[in-house]
Amino acid sequence: MTIHIKNNVNWVGQRDWEVSDFHGTEFKMTKGTSYNSYLIQEEKTILIDTVDHRFSHQFIQNLEMEIDLTSIDYIVINHAEEDHAGALAALMEKIPGTPIYCTENAIDSIVGHHHHPEWNFKPIKTGDALDIGNGKQLVFVEAPMLHWPDSMMTYLTGDAILFSNDAFGQHYCDERLFNDEVDQTELMDQCLRYYANILTPFSALVTAKIKEVLSFNLPVDMIATSHGCVWRDNPTQIIHQYLEWADNYQEDRITLFYDSMSNNTRMMADAIAQGIHDVDPGVAVKVFNVSRQDKNDILTSVFRSKGILVGSSTMNNVMMPKIAGMLEEITGLRFRAKKAGAFGSYGWNGGAVDRIHSRLTDAGFETAVGLKAKWRPDGKAMQLCREHGQFIAKQWALKPVTTTFQTINVEKKTIPASIAEPVIMVDPSVSSTVESEISVIASNDDKQCMLCTVCNWVYDPEIGEPNQGVEPNTAWIDVPDYFLCPECNLGKDVFVEVK
């Protein structure tokens, strides 16, 4: 099956309605995908990319119905990943000497996957051109790390088609191939989901590469992607959208996601979300349970947000495993210009919140004060959680908030950037009319040593902790509330007096 693209260019790819996972389990596909391969028939015949290896036989069978395979003069591989070049081995069995145009990095990857160093590779550089007859050329543009080191784009002069590889694509399967034929909301949702989960770490490179391509002053009448729809109606709309997404994108949105052992942390999330809405009804608040909802939906919401709040029950003194996994994904995606905070419930130790706070800080977020609740929050504790949401709403507002609510009065402290900020402790026995205070174990003895109940590290007042700005001869009661155990990275609440 072929679909006519323009003049002597046809789509010869493969639709995949059933696929659900991409990059292992990194990306969940909700709308299937397509593997777009293109056949150009000028004086020379060129095949741009193949399809996923699972469809090799079907791809070659369909191609043989259209042309004599031996008439293919050149193969162009924009990307060596298996969903682009997966059928290459089967194709080369049919036409073994055919030149393959790709980047040097692609040669390394293709040989690594298929183990055929004898193939007729033709390495390219940005600006190289290949004459294909009828006054037309293929112009190559390297695009490393969009999203692999081997990536490149190919431009067809005369027809003004940019074969853009993964850029501007989407995992979206439809019998209709062109962007103006499909549901526009679905299309843009899938474009955003694709960018947020796959291209976000390379946003600076996206901007630089788009500006480089635009500097060539080449007309672009059509963008033929490697996945999903071909952009023929106003194709530059997706280019401008990418530039916006790459520029520290955020909406007036706050995303909360959590995992909970006994629904206690879920209760906190609900109350915090309500508090945010109390103060700023205009902000979009989205709440997700990581154990029950799709992680890529959550990450897309994080991408769209000005700030996130991450909650977890404490289990074995650490956060729940799925929260840890989400934070690892978030760290890899390298979000920028976003705020974050931690919250969670605990029984005898609230280490999860401290660890979440540290991970968010390390991931580049501007971190806010965290919130811990002991055991199941009662009505008073829920009110304090709601007030915490009100506090967050005011602190993170993109414009002045006129709604007046009494919020938690968190004392401002001068805190070194490398040290985690304080955590508010919510105890069900505390009256909601009393301001929350940071819970510490105080000792009136200036020389009293303190023992970390988690790792057994001992704080000695005579020595202090210079790495955290705690001078020698500092009594425990005077140690700053942002202090963390240097061994296990937990807060002051896990310390007890050495008897």
UniProtKB/Swiss-Prot annotation:
The keyword Cytoplasm applies. GO terms for molecular function: electron transfer activity; FMN binding; iron ion binding; nitric oxide reductase activity. Residues 254-393 form the Flavodoxin-like domain. Residues 30-210 are annotated as: Zinc metallo-hydrolase. It comes from the Bacteria. Fe cation 3 binds at C452, C455, C485, C488. It is found in: Cytoplasm. It holds the Pfam family Rubredoxin. Its cofactor is Fe cation; FMN. Keywords: Cytoplasm, Electron transport, Flavoprotein, FMN, Iron, Metal-binding, Oxidoreductase, Transport. InterPro entries: Anaer_NO_rdtase_flvorubredoxin, Flavodoxin/NO_synth, Flavoprotein-like_sf, Metallo-B-lactamas, ODP_dom, RibonucZ/Hydroxyglut_hydro, Rubredoxin-like_dom, Rubredoxin_dom. Binds 3 Fe cations per monomer. Binds 1 FMN per monomer. GO terms for cellular component: cytoplasm. The keyword Oxidoreductase applies. Fe cation 2 binds at D83, D166, H227. Pathway: Nitrogen metabolism; nitric oxide reduction. In the N-terminal section; belongs to the zinc metallo-hydrolase group 3 family. Homotetramer. Anaerobic nitric oxide reductase; uses NADH to detoxify nitric oxide (NO), protecting several 4Fe-4S NO-sensitive enzymes. Has at least 2 reductase partners, only one of which (NorW, flavorubredoxin reductase) has been identified. NO probably binds to the di-iron center; electrons enter from the NorW at rubredoxin and are transferred sequentially to the FMN center and the di-iron center. Also able to function as an aerobic oxygen reductase. NCBIfam families: PRK05452.1. PANTHER family: ANAEROBIC NITRIC OXIDE REDUCTASE FLAVORUBREDOXIN. This is Anaerobic nitric oxide reductase flavorubredoxin. The gene is norV.
